[in-house]
Structure formats: C-alpha cells, structure tokens
Design a protein with these regions (language model features):
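Domain-level signature for soluble enzymes in the chorismate/prephenate branch of the shikimate pathway
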Residues: 1-281
C-alpha cells in the first residue's frame, strides 16, 4: 500500500525517479515537467515529499533549483547521493550493430562520449534521458538507441544492449528531500547532521568577511557557500550555505549569532541527517 506521493522533475524512468524508488519504496513517485511544478505539488499537498537534484559531481549545481529553493517556502528534511549510470537501450530484438543514432539529453550524451565515439553513432538531443526512452518506445526504430537509466528500459519495454556506458564511473548526483511542513521533526541527535541556510549581508564594507568569521572562530565546518543575485539586481546578492552540525550545537549557535549581526536576511532551510555516502572515500 502506498504511503503517500513524492514529486520529482522529469519523465518516469529518470534518475530522479530511481532516487525516489531507492529512498522511499513505499511512496508513489509523481513526475512533473518542470521544477516549478514539482515544487508547487509539494506546497499544495498534492505530494507529501519531493526529491530534487541540486548538484552533480561532473556537471555542477542545478541552477534552476538553487534559484527556486530560497523562496519556495519548503523545508529540507534529508539528502541522498545517487551514483549515476547510463544504459544504452533499443527496441526489442534490435542488434547493437544496426544502431546508427543515439538520443538522450545533452549532458548524458556528453558523459557517454567515449562509447558513442567508439560505436560511431550520431547523436540526437532531447530534454530528458527517460524521455528519449519513452519516445523510442512510442516510435520504434531499429537504427536508433536511447541513453537512459535502467528503470526507463523496464518501464518502456526496451532492451539494454550496453550497460554502464558513462565515461566516468564516480558520477554522482546529490538530491534534497523536501517537505511543505513548516516545522518538520528534527533529526535524531545520534546522527551527524547538515544545516542549510540562506542569508544576505548588510551593505557595509567587508560584511561577508565579518559574517564568516564566527564559523572559523567557533570551529564550524562550512561545506558549501554559493552566491546568487536576487531579482536580477547586482547589488542584492544573497548566499546559500551548508555547515556540519545543527543549530542547537553551541559552536554553530554562536556562529549564527555573529552571522546575523552582519546580515539583513537569514533563514534556515533545513536541518537533516548527513547521508552516509559523505564518508565514502
């Protein structure tokens, strides 16, 4: 029996869909064409959770998400790291030797360049990896293949003719688990935690330098600091940051106190358990 619905951006069979299934096997994944629609589904309660990609070890941050996140009204309650693997799939009965063209989203084609070059395939760009599999299923073509996650082959009745064809095998995407709850239950104190927050410093000389000082003097490990322009204004820069620990920790509480003294805007977006993947070498 389903334990609720979880929103993601993309087609059924996408990497985000696989992440939903792996992390929340009892929930029903719900696909949305855009990140805006996925966020809206969470906010309205149509979906209880969201699985949102924020960065990839090769491609970098997902810019659309970082611009939506600070003003979304949602909270972060978890993170998941997912190794990314791409499969070459065809219509049933098609032999690899017959394939002349491969379709997928541009970033997937780029990350499988070695295999594509070795097989001497032409490329065709589509907006989503799973969409390439869906289109191939709907319009069978013995000369065409798709690059997509394994789940897409299962959903759309395709056959995998080459597995894990990505050039770099440490390709990993980080996802955030989102909720519309204003005050979600705090993570257990037995778990290492991450705190995500946004802030905008006051308009004064060296404000950012001074705002950051409390993290150094209190021994708080900041793992991420990224700047963004708000509403297209070059003078209204705000920052997204992540630190190890939780606001109840004395060291982080002191660092936040100093940060807020030099900031005109500050909001904690979430306190959540650190994924064990972080400790892997």
């Amino acid at each position: 029996m389903s334990q609720g619905r979880i929103a993601f951006q993309g087609e059924l069979g996408a990497n985000s869909h696989e992440a939903c299934v792996a992390a929340f096997p009892d929930m029903t994944p719900v696909a949305h064409p855009t990140f805006e629609e996925a966020f809206e589904a969470i906010k309205t309660g149509d979906c209880q959770l969201g699985m949102i990609p924020v960065e990839n070890s090769i491609a970098g941050r997902v810019a659309d998400v970082h611009h939506l996140l600070p003003n979304s009204g949602l909270k972060i309650i978890g993170e998941r790291f997912k190794p990314i693997h791409f499969q070459l799939m065809v219509n049933p009965g098609v032999r690899l030797e017959a394939v002349k063209t491969v379709a997928s989203m541009p970033i997937a084609l780029a990350q499988c360049r070695g295999t594509i070059r070795r097989l001497k395939l032409k490329t065709e760009q589509v907006g989503d990896t799973a969409l390439s599999a869906k289109l191939l299923s709907e319009h069978p073509d013995p000369a065409k293949a798709a690059i997509a996650p394994a789940l897409a082959a299962e959903l759309y009745g395709l056959e995998i003719v080459a597995r894990d064809i990505e050039d770099t095998h440490n390709n990993t995407t980080r996802f955030l688990v989102m909720t519309a709850e204003k005050a979600p239950a705090p993570p257990p104190f037995t778990s290492p935690c991450v705190t995500s927050f946004v802030f905008r410093v006051r308009n004064m000389p060296a404000a950012l330098y001074k705002a950051m000082g409390g993290f150094a003097t209190n021994g708080v490990n900041m793992t991420k600091l990224e700047s963004y322009m708000e509403n297209g204004a070059f003078t209204a820069t705000f920052f997204y940051a992540e630190v190890d620990g939780r606001p109840e920790d004395r060291s982080l509480a002191l660092a936040f106190e100093e940060l807020q003294f030099f900031s005109e805007q500050f909001e904690i977006l979430g306190v959540y358990p650190a994924d064990p993947f972080r400790t892997r070498v």
